[in-house]
Amino acid sequence: MKIELFYNPGCPICPKAKKLVKKLLRKYPQVEYVELNAFEHQDRVIQLGFQAVPAIVIDGALWHVGIPDKKALKKKIIGTLG
């Protein structure tokens, strides 16, 4: 399982989203986690079709834009990992 978090350096809420995801993923070390600057990866942003950050992509599919709900993200991780 791979989680990508797209952010922009000037985004005021991105640090909160990063912190939430990283804290949750401490319980799931088998999950690959990558943070990507949306400006530097505009091809992926266009491909995935989002226009705001933070954006969370799980296994190549856009899952959420904005600060994620911790319980919903945990449920998604558990459901994906099986």
Give a label for each model feature.
Residues 8, 38, 50:
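ATP/adenylate-binding site constellation spanning eukaryotic-like Ser/Thr protein kinases
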Residues 30-42:
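Thiol-based oxidoreductase modules, predominantly thioredoxin-like and allied folds used
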Residues 58-82:
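Non-catalytic, surface beta->alpha helical segment in thiol-disulfide oxidoreductase systems
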Residues 12-13, 40, 72:
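Short alpha-helical
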Residues 48-56:
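Structural micro-motif
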Residues 1-23, 27:
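Local sequence-structure signature of Cys/Sec-based thiol-disulfide redox active-site neighborhoods
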Residues 15-19, 47-48, 68:
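Generic recognition of short, well-ordered alpha-helical segments
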